[in-house]
Amino acid sequence: ATFRVLAKVLAELGKVSRKIAVGVDNESGGSWTALNAYFRSGTTDVILPDLVPNQKALLYRGGKDTGPVATGVVGVLAYAMSDGNTLAILFSVPYDYNLYSNWWNVKVYSGKRRADQGMSEDLSYGNPYGGDNGWHARKLAYGLKERGFMKSSAQSILEIHATKA
């Protein structure tokens, strides 16, 4: 995924005040199959892409609930990897920037595991990155590493590259 493609995905969300476009490049050597998307707050109007082959990208978007509600968008995407483990991606774009800021995280879980509130909390409190307009990288489990970038704005972009370690 490139910033240009993600900017187009973001624009398709229209005038939603808290929104995000997520792009995850699969450079893992295997394929990924969608398990689910879990939203702690916010929603989406698109279906989670079912299959992400190696050398392709997952593109997704989310936004705050419509109407006069004081929420942002916080979600987790879960993908079963062809090695039998689960790739999870957390994104958070808060409603109130006086109290919170954007953040994100990536983790590989052992076995097949759907995204839920427990996974959301694990990723939220498991040393997430700030959405600080900077690149961050770390080794993940099971032979993977990630490198990613998230904008600090209320209309955010999250770009992640998952590669062999």
Curated annotation (Swiss-Prot):
Localization (cell): Secreted; Nematocyst; Target cell membrane
Pfam name, any one: Anemone_cytotox
Molecular function GO labels: channel activity; toxin activity
GO cellular component terms, semicolon-separated: extracellular region; nematocyst; other organism cell membrane; pore complex
SUPFAM superfamilies according to UniProt: Cytolysin/lectin
Superkingdom classification of source: Eukaryota
GO biological process: cytolysis in another organism; monoatomic cation transport; pore complex assembly
Keywords of the record: Cytolysis, Ion transport, Membrane, Nematocyst, Secreted, Target cell membrane, Target membrane, Toxin, Transmembrane, Transport
Site keyed Important in the initial contact with the lipid membrane: positions: 100
Gene3D superfamilies: Cytolysin/lectin (2.60.270.20)
Keyword Chaperone included in the entry's annotation: no
UniProt region (N-terminal region), positions on chain: 1-17
SUBUNIT field: Octamer or nonamer in membranes. Monomer in the soluble state.
Family: Belongs to the actinoporin family. Sea anemone subfamily.
Domain notes: Composed of a long N-terminal alpha-helix and a core region rich in beta-sheet structures. Before the pore formation, the alpha-helix binds the lipid membrane, partitions into the lipid-water interface and stabilizes the monomeric molecule on the membrane. Finally, it traverses the bilayer, thus forming the transmembrane pore.
Function recorded in the entry: Pore-forming protein that forms cations-selective hydrophilic pores of around 1 nm and causes cardiac stimulation and cytolysis. Pore formation is a multi-step process that involves specific recognition of membrane sphingomyelin (but neither cholesterol nor phosphatidylcholine) using aromatic rich region and adjacent phosphocholine (POC) binding site, firm binding to the membrane (mainly driven by hydrophobic interactions) accompanied by the transfer of the N-terminal region to the lipid-water interface and finally pore formation after oligomerization of monomers.
Protein name per the record: DELTA-actitoxin-Oor1a
